[in-house]
Amino acid sequence: MNIKPEEITSIIKKEIEKYEKDIKTVDSGTIIQIGDGVSRVYGLDNCMQGELLEFPNNVYGMVLNLEQDNVGCVLLGEEKGIKEGDTVKGTGRVVEVPVGEAMIGRVVNALGEPIDGKGPISTSQTRAIEIPAAGIIDRSSVNEPLQTGIKAIDSMIPIGRGQRELIIGDRQTGKTAIAIDTILNQKGKDVICIYVAIGQKQSTVAHIFNTLTEMGAMDYSIVVSATASESAPLQYMAPYSGCTIGEYFMHQGKDVLIIYDDLSKHATAYRAMSLLLKRPPGREAYPGDVFYIHSRLLERAAKLSKELGGGSITALPIIETQAGDVTAYIPTNVISITDGQIFLESDLFNAGQRPAVNAGISVSRVGGSAQIKAMKQVSGTLRLELAQYRELEAFSQFGSDLDADSSRRLEKGKRLVEVLKQDQYSPLEVGKQIIILYAAVNDFLSDIKVSDIKRFEKEFLEYVDTHHREIEKSIITGKTLTDEIKSMLEEAIVEFKKIFLQEA
């Protein structure tokens, strides 16, 4: 057998040409310090802010500090088994969460992983948790109402789709109750609701989930949970993850309602992380950029322009105050970022006025332009009349004799306060709210005892529903109170009052 040297060389050449060697370069570093959920890594020269790092034992970390010779990062899992000297790899990716229709009805953690025991979430799409907010050109003004189903709010502090309205008050004043009622009221209104629990007890989150399930609200809701037992980095990430999940739906042209419960605990988690990363503390030991963590989150709530599909995110952040002090650092920060606040007072709550909304210092800066005309017509004088009532009430406690006009205002105020009371988990449709508020504002309840107002409201709305259904229909379709609707409504009130007073 003759083997020609040329043939051998050509075969070798072909083999060499075919050979491809993939060189994989990995940016890696060494742990020089670890503890308290925080690590310092040396040698990651090409690292970026917010990058995911891969630690041993399949644990990930997020870069927050870029320093001259090392990077500071927070761990997103257990630090058990990880020690100084271990190798850490850079991934070149930032933190992302899964998004999509499959998220609806699920309970997920801050990383978007399911924690409700219903199996994996079937979605392949992911989005980064930190995305710049929509620009001025991409937005349109707030012009559609988002009904909460709560009379005191929809009448005096209206909320529009795309607005950011702060709910602020001491602990145990009904802040979460308002948020949950608002979610329940979105049933059948094509609004996706996201409830973000930050630093709450696990039992509280379980109770909220059970309530939403029983009321059929989980069909259009998502719960993002980072409870008190989870690490500070996960509590810090939760609202951004919730917002990213909501932005997916907003860009589909849908309306989203997102509740952050609460941002006080979010700031506390960020403070803990910052102090462990040895960032210089400022006022109340918060780091200097604590304003920015909330502003960049809440600026992502928007009403998009028609060209971008006209979707919206309405944000209801919650802040817990200490003894009604709204001048503390975090409350003043969030008040200045949002488009208004609903202020809840423990004194009103303890006096039996629930929801305990203080109409005097609560305000909605943009919601008025989204309120329907019929509601504007009935609630125009409501805030003023309540303010006058509060003043007269304080004055009348001294026992001095009041003139007839003051007595009339005092009696009317008592009835208005009674009408604005509402049970939890019983949101009212806007048409029904307008009907009962019209009766209260226009002095039709002056001959009804204050103790009977609640029963009168319930029975009157049932009466209108069975005998005069066209009134509510006309209000909802026309969105304004014409003279014709007013006369129909007044007739119905007079008719029912005769029946009610005879029974009484």
Curated annotation (Swiss-Prot):
Catalytic activity: ATP + H2O + 4 H(+)(in) = ADP + phosphate + 5 H(+)(out)
Gene Ontology CC terms: plasma membrane; proton-transporting ATP synthase complex
Keyword vocabulary terms for this entry: ATP synthesis, ATP-binding, Cell membrane, CF(1), Hydrogen ion transport, Ion transport, Membrane, Nucleotide-binding, Translocase, Transport
Domain of life, source organism: Bacteria
Chain residues that bind ATP: G169, D170, R171, Q172, T173, G174, K175, T176
A single GO molecular function term of this UniProt record: ATP binding
Top-level EC class as recorded in UniProt: translocase
EC number: 7.1.2.2
UniProt-listed NCBIfam families: atpA, PRK13343.1
Assembly and binders: F-type ATPases have 2 components, CF(1) - the catalytic core - and CF(0) - the membrane proton channel. CF(1) has five subunits: alpha(3), beta(3), gamma(1), delta(1), epsilon(1). CF(0) has three main subunits: a(1), b(2) and c(9-12). The alpha and beta chains form an alternating ring which encloses part of the gamma chain. CF(1) is attached to CF(0) by a central stalk formed by the gamma and epsilon chains, while a peripheral stalk is formed by the delta and b chains.
Name of the protein in question: ATP synthase subunit alpha
Lineage: Bacteria, Bacillati, Bacillota, Clostridia, Eubacteriales
Gene: atpA
